[in-house]
Amino acid sequence: GLLLEKDSGERRLDDLRLYFLSYRSHSNQNRLILGNYRLEVAQGLIFNSPYGYSKGSDPIFPARQRERALLEYTIVDENASLCGVAGQFCFKIYQFFLFLSNTQRDASLNDDGTVKNFYTSGYHRNDLEMNKKDKLNERLIGGRVLIKPIPNLSLGTTFYRSIFDPVAAIQDEDLHRFSFAGKTNELIGLDYNFIHRQFNLFGEIARSRNNGFGVLSGVLMESKLLSFIVLGRRYSKDFHSFYGNSFSESGDNPQNESGIYTGFQLKPINNLKIKIYFDQFEFPWPTYRIPMPSSGKDMLFRTEYKLTKNLLFSLQYKFEQKDQFNSLFEQVIPRDKRNLRIQLDFQPSSLLRLRCRGEKNWIKYHYPQLLKSRYPHNFQGVLLYQDASLTMHPNFDIAARLTFFDTDNYESRLYQFEHDIPGMLTNQMLDGIGTRNYIRIQWSIKNFLSLSLKYATTHSYPNFPDERRSYRDLEKRIHSINVQLETNW
């Protein structure tokens, strides 16, 4: 496989170049990959997809990760790929993984040539960003052993050692006091998965070279009427896992977070599902958003009712309370966010799917009483969209969406996941007043060749324009096109 990608504003059409050669045995158990690859093992503390799994409408699935082992790297995140050789070998109750990698990473350098920080956005649009490209070399060697002594029990251990050149400098600021520094990082972890009837016990614990640790453990129960999961997590402030992306509130590498998550799914009658989750979390050390310890909680209630064979109605309410730092007052202000979503899914035939969604959110800042009258603290936003997916032929399908949005400001912005070309995940942010439309086409030209294309346009104005400027000056029109040609042999 070969993947070339260029972000908007970048000069080179092949700013990102990825390639791989993959071999699978007839049993599909033994694998060998040369080139770019990734690993998804255990609960993701050491290796996982860069996108991970975030909380959503399903309260069970995101909290219990399924091991996908060794995979070709076919996504466009520019900082999560390993490049070299990797193999997966199975022998009865044992599985062995061996991997080597030599990759170039983006980084900002100090005047003395040491690494100031890792640059992870992947953008190389100007000289400043280009000067960060491929400044850091990482050599990595590691392995994994998985044993299944009995059919319902698996035990695993994962380890790797990476060497960086140049070295990462020690930083004095409180925010970066526990950031990675030095030339070498090592991780070793243990994981388990035990299934007994309807119950599943699972977890993973890992330690980095500087004795920072991460631990994740949970229990899952599944039945026809009720499923529930309880998951605890704790990631120390000095835990360094650059390829890890386990369950967390931050959605980043597991570090500086602890919390407990509980999720339920009930099916009281055939056509009705009720889904609930609650998550309480805290960040014991300052983060880049808040220069002091902070905490929060969120909950979701969702009901899905199948009105007819082809018509599904869903209602979702989500509440989130998180600490926010106000630089003007230099204090933490609690922020409440409430979101209500109503959705209809209609599938008149196996070829056509329609979706209509209405969504509204409310934002409230809990300022001290003396400040409430002086500063706005309530904001709202609303979104409406119509979505259609049409399969005109087994090898050809079209997806299109028309979206209207109206938000008070950036604080009340809304997001929507969109269909995109394979390997890309789009969670589009919308603020102001306007529309966003797109069309995506996927065409399997031959068994070994496929074409994907997406065209999108956004037209918007700010809700509170500057009186000194006209709407024409404030108008935003953004057009984008993504094209991907994929071949397999």
Question: Over which residues does each language-model region extend?
Answer:
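Exposed, low-structure sequence patches enriched in small/polar residues
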Residues: L18, A80, E138, G143-I170, ...
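Outer membrane beta-barrel
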Residues: G9-A69, T74-D106, L226-H240, N395-Y410
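Short acidic, glycine/serine/threonine-rich loops at helix termini
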Residues: G44-N48, N110-D112, A169-Q171, S241-Y243
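Ordered hydrophobic segments in well-structured contexts
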Residues: L3, I33, A86-Q88, F99, ...
